[in-house]
Amino acid sequence: MKKILSALLLIFAILLSACGVVKYEYKDGVMYGDGKEATGTFEFKAGKYKVKGNFVNGVPDGLFEEYYPDGNIMIKDTFVNGENTREELYYKNGQLMGTFADDEDLKLYYNDGKLVMTYNDKTGESIIYHENGNPLMVTNDKESAIYNENKEMLFKVENAKAVDIGTTLKKLEDGSFELVKNNKVVAKIDANGELIKYLYSTGETMLKVNEATGVTEFFFKNGNTFMKEDGNKNVLNYKDGKPLYEMDGNSWKIYNEEGEKIAEDFELVTNIKKVD
C-alpha cells in the first residue's frame, strides 16, 4: 500500500512539474517569464487600470490598450520594439482626448470634441483655442498673435517687435492705461506697466500677463483659469478649473475629469496573465 501511495505521489509531482505555472514579472520595461524575456499577448494591471498588449522578446511591440474600470478604452499606445511611437487618450464617453506622436506633434481636445491645444513639431507652431473653437493664441518661431473669441486680433509681435494692429493707448486719471481698438477697450494696463489684462469682447478678463512675476494666465469666460504659464511649468485646465494637462520641464501628466492621473508609464505592474 505504501509503495502504491509513493508511486501515486511521484506521478502527481511529475504532473505538477510538467504543468507548472510560469512566473511573469515586468521589470525595467521588460516582461519576463521565469527569468527569461517573454513573448506573447498579456493582460495586467498598471496601477489601478487594466492593460492588454503584446510583447516580443520582453519588450512592448504593437498596440496596447488601457481601460477605464467600466471597460471603455482609456488609452491606446502603439509600440515599435519597445518605443512608444503614438498615444491616443479617450474620455469616458469615448471622445478623443488627445494624441501624441513620436515626432512630438500634440493635439488636445475637450470632451465635446473641440480643440484645446495643438503643437506641430515640424513648423514649431502652437495654437491655443477658445471655448468656441476659434484660435486664442498662435505662436511659432518668428511671430505670436492673440485673438479674442470673435477672431479679432488684440496683439501681435514679429521677430520680437510689436506690430501696429490699429490700437491706441489711452491714459486714465489714476495713472493706468487702456488699449483701445475700433473705439472699444481691448486691454487694461496698470500704472507701472507691469500687469496687462486682455479682455473678451464682452469685457471679461481673457488673458493676464504679469511682467513682474513672469506669470501668464488665460481665463475662461466663467472666470476659471484656462491655462497658466509660470517659468517651465504649464497647466491646462478643464472648464471647472480641474487640471487636464500639466507640464514641468520635460515631464508631463494628463488627468481625467475626476482629477485622476491617467497617462503614465507602466510604473506599477501587477496581476500579469498571458492570454495568447
Kindly label every feature range from the protein language model.
Residues 1-4:
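Positively charged n-region of N-terminal signal peptides that target proteins for export
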Residues 8-15:
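Bacterial N-terminal signal peptides
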Residues 17-276:
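Glycine/tyrosine- and acidic-biased, solvent-exposed loop/turn segments at the edges of beta-strands
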